[in-house]
Amino acid sequence: MKRFDPEPQYALTGPTYFMGDVHGDYDLVEADLYIRDYTPGNLILLGDIGLGFCFEEVDKTRQFYDFCSSLGKLGWTVYAVRGNHDRPAEWRCAPNSVKVEGFPRLLKDNTTIAINDHLFYVTGGGVSLDRHRRTPGKSWWEDEPMYVPPEAVKELKGKVYGVLSHVGPMPTGRIPVSTSDAGLEQDLERERIQVRRLLKMKPKKWFYGHYHKDDLQLVDDTDCICLGVRSLYPFLDYGM
């Protein structure tokens, strides 16, 4: 298990936006950014990007890199948190930092980044509710769950402004769970333990996707902002 490194992986400045699940629909993301005429800056995808995900023999990896290159020419830099529908090995093998324009920055699990002088803890992954109908090694991975080491909580408690992850506190409203997967509920309980562990860091803000629903709730004095599919949230505090 990767040990926690308190040194920020990246230091971002300028306009920054968080986005919910993309699911490989990169053309729709690019079109939306263009139509809405957002000021180019940092685009942080909160998992389920489709990187390394192969469904019906279609691998979205090449398309993702082309998408990042295209946005790079427009002044955007893409950062990505790992989702449960992203191949974990892509993040493990990625360089710790990237300076090439138009090349995606994969935010590794259990790291931090600075956004306009605000410190964020980053961790990816999650449990796939639909894994019973997925193909191991292609569209589902045993090492997909999120894990938060206790030493990270001890080191960062009260020191982080926010958390960036794929899963988070359950949005309001019931989320259906498959009954055809005997071990699913047990794995989801392990995931809830990780969520509670993250709340002990006492972040002010927590941004995440996964649940395909826009939702805002206050949990243990933390503003928990869940972003739906391709929902965009501008982080406006960039010194203006």
Where are these regions (language model features)?
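Catalytic metal-binding/acid-base residues of hydrolase active sites
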Residues: 22-23, 49-50, 84-88, 126-127, ...
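Conserved beta-strand scaffold positions in the cores of enzyme catalytic domains, especially
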Residues: 16, 78-80, 105-106, 120, ...
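Zn-dependent metallo-beta-lactamase
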Residues: 1-18, 24
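Binuclear metal-dependent phosphoesterase catalytic core
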Residues: 113-116, 196-201, 211-240
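Active-site-proximal loop/helix segment associated with metal-binding centers of metalloenzymes
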Residues: 3-5, 118-189
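Proline-aspartate-enriched helix->loop->beta-strand connector
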Residues: 40, 160, 164-165, 169, ...
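Core catalytic region of metal-dependent phosphoesterases/phosphodiesterases
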Residues: 19, 24-115, 188, 199
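Structural motif
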Residues: 15-16, 42, 118-120, 161-162, ...
